[in-house]
């Protein structure tokens, strides 16, 4: 029996255990909640985008956005539904996001479900627009701080990273393009693009979590044009002096043409030592082409026919035809037009260039003065439909972005990758099967032809051998070519034997057959003479024997 004194102790232990479990669960839930709260902005598109994302009202943007599932998944995204259209849609943030302090991570997924031959799949992170701007007015002229994402058309194949920066001296915004950006993946799988903007002026571009490019905002080697302008510029008002001599070399003014310099001597002269080759056919010029005249040529309507000339057939074996002329050769006395040699120009001043002046647009800074992100927009033109945007994220920590990649993108990608692998294996198997069936069909036709060859009358003596070879080939298809060659050799051998060496044996066989018939007839008349005739026949036609070799 259970001791009643132990019941309170057991209940206490159970309560402690339940509290521990509850505390652990609460801890994990809080951690997950904290992780979500760390995202400045996140759009999963699990719910319809209507009334949250605003489609541009501009007439040129006639592409239809749809809330659609990614192919093969239950996960929804924002879909480009029609090809050869312009698209524009925007989502205003609850509060502007500063890009100046600390790390900022921009991340989103795209899936090019029908590929991308010519079009964009990038996102624009818009700056605060002018007063009175409405999301319905979003277009290509709407200012952005950063443009990031895939773009492909013709020779262009890159993941854009462009930032717009306001010049503090001029007030103008300048686009600065990342040099040598990474390429866009060429498959139709989901891919996640991440840009990590760090406080040390570095930016890292990741594709599927793997760093593909690192750059520095202040480096002229990483961005074109450079963020910080040059200190000086060529003076636009400076002009080259009229007496500025840029010629490094000039003709020697004191040089004199030699007296024996013959400018009129020709480059080539007739070779007087040449002799006419024998047998040169002097009286065999080109002849009319007898086959050139069209059959429907009518002299009355089309005029008198003038046949084109062709080479005289008699000239094929001769060194030449027609009138022979001596060839020309290089003239050893040829010098050409005389010109004075060049000397260093004593007045040479070098290649002129305008003088440098202070650049009025020059400024210095330690960090880019990014304008905050006030909205997220997609403004693209594409020839392909099926582009799906999903899981748009802005965060202050790249660990948050990594967590989202692991939980939202990677499971989908793994499924798609496995499916792609199976499809490629199936396609390879189908191609191999098709190739095998094609080869099998060719082999069947080849063997059918070989059987027909075996039935040719003059091959009757070799028919069994040929059939045996063919049947062996049918059992071992990889020997088909060898079998064909073997049969062709047999065929050609017998054919040549028949054409070039078969007449005499045929006559001998006819004579033997004739004598055999006569012998049989005579044997009926006189049985005693049968053996005598046989001996005479053997004496007259002794069999050919191979000489024996001494071992």
UniProtKB/Swiss-Prot annotation:
GO BP term, pick one: ERAD pathway
Residues covered by region (4 X approximate repeats): 235-299, 303-360
Residues covered by region (Disordered): 226-330, 510-551
Compositionally biased spans, kind Basic and acidic residues: 234-269, 276-295, 526-539
Segments in the Cytoplasmic topological domain: 502-551
Disulfide bonds: 118-153, 315-321
Any one GO MF annotation of this record: unfolded protein binding
Keyword Disulfide bond applies: yes
Residues in Sequence repeats: 235-246, 252-263, 271-282, 289-299, 303-313, 322-332, 336-346, 350-360
Topological category with respect to the lipid bilayer: Single-pass type I membrane protein
Binding of Ca(2+), residues: 44, 75, 390
Subcellular location: Endoplasmic reticulum membrane
Highest taxon of source: Eukaryota
Task of the protein: Calcium-binding protein that interacts with newly synthesized monoglucosylated glycoproteins in the endoplasmic reticulum. It may act in assisting protein assembly and/or in the retention within the ER of unassembled protein subunits. It seems to play a major role in the quality control apparatus of the ER by the retention of incorrectly folded proteins.
Matches recorded under PANTHER family: CALNEXIN HOMOLOG, CALRETICULIN AND CALNEXIN
Family to which this protein belongs: Belongs to the calreticulin family.
Protein name: Calnexin homolog
Source organism (scientific name): Pisum sativum (Garden pea)
Organism lineage string: Eukaryota, Viridiplantae, Streptophyta, Embryophyta, Tracheophyta
């Amino acid at each position: 029996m259970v001791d009643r004194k132990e019941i309170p102790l057991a209940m206490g232990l159970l309560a402690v255990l339940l509290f521990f479990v509850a505390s652990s669960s609460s801890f994990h839930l809080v951690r997950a909640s904290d992780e979500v709260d760390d995202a400045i902005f996140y759009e999963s598109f699990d719910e319809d985008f209507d009334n949250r994302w605003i489609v541009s009202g501009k007439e040129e943007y006639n592409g239809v956005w749809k809330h659609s599932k990614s192919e093969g998944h239950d996960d929804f995204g924002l879909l480009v539904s029609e090809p050869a259209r312009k698209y524009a849609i925007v989502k205003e943030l609850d509060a502007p996001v500063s890009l100046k302090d600390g790390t900022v991570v921009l991340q989103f997924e795209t899936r090019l479900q029908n590929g991308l031959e010519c079009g964009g799949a990038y996102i624009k992170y818009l700056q605060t627009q002018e007063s009175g701007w409405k999301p319905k007015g979003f277009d290509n002229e709407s200012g952005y701080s950063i443009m990031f994402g895939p773009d492909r058309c013709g020779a262009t194949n890159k993941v854009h990273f462009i930032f717009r920066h306001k010049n503090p001296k001029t007030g103008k915004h300048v686009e600065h393009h990342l040099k040598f950006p990474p390429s866009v993946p060429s498959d139709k799988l989901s891919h996640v693009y991440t840009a990590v903007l760090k406080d040390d002026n570095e930016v890292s571009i990741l594709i599927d979590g793997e760093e593909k490019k690192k750059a520095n905002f202040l480096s002229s080697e990483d961005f074109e044009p450079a963020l910080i302008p040059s200190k000086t510029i060529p003076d636009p008002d400076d002009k080259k002096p009229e007496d500025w001599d840029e010629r490094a070399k000039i003709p020697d003014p004191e040089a004199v043409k030699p007296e024996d310099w013959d400018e009129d001597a020709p480059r080539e002269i007739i070779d007087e030592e040449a002799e006419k080759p024998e047998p040169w056919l002097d009286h065999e010029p080109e002849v009319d082409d007898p086959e050139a005249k069209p059959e429907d040529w009518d002299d009355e309507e089309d005029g008198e026919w003038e046949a084109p000339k062709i080479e005289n057939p008699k000239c094929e074996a001769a060194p030449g035809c027609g009138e022979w002329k001596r060839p020309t050769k290089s003239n050893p006395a040829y010098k050409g037009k005389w010109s004075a040699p060049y000397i260093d120009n004593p007045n040479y001043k070098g290649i002129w260039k305008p003088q440098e002046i202070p650049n009025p647009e020059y400024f210095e800074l330690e960090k880019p003065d990014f304008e905050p992100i006030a909205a997220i927009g997609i403004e693209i033109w594409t020839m392909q439909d099926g582009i799906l945007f999903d899981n748009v994220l802005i965060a202050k920590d790249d660990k948050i972005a990594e967590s989202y990649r692991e939980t939202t993108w990677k499971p989908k990608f793994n499924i798609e990758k496995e499916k792609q692998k199976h499809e490629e294996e199936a396609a390879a198997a189908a191609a191999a099967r098709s190739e095998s069936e094609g080869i099998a069909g060719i082999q069947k036709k080849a063997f059918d032809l070989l059987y027909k060859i075996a039935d040719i009358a003059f091959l009757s003596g070799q028919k069994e051998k040929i059939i045996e070879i063919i049947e062996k080939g049918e059992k071992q298809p990889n020997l088909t070519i060898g079998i064909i060659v073997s049969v062709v050799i047999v065929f050609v051998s017998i054919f040549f034997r028949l054409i070039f060496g078969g007449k005499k044996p045929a006559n001998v066989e006819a004579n033997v057959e004739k004598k055999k018939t006569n012998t049989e007839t005579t044997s009926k008349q006189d049985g005693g003479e049968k053996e005598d005739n046989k001996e005479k026949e053997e004496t007259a036609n002794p069999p050919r024997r191979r000489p024996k070799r001494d071992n």
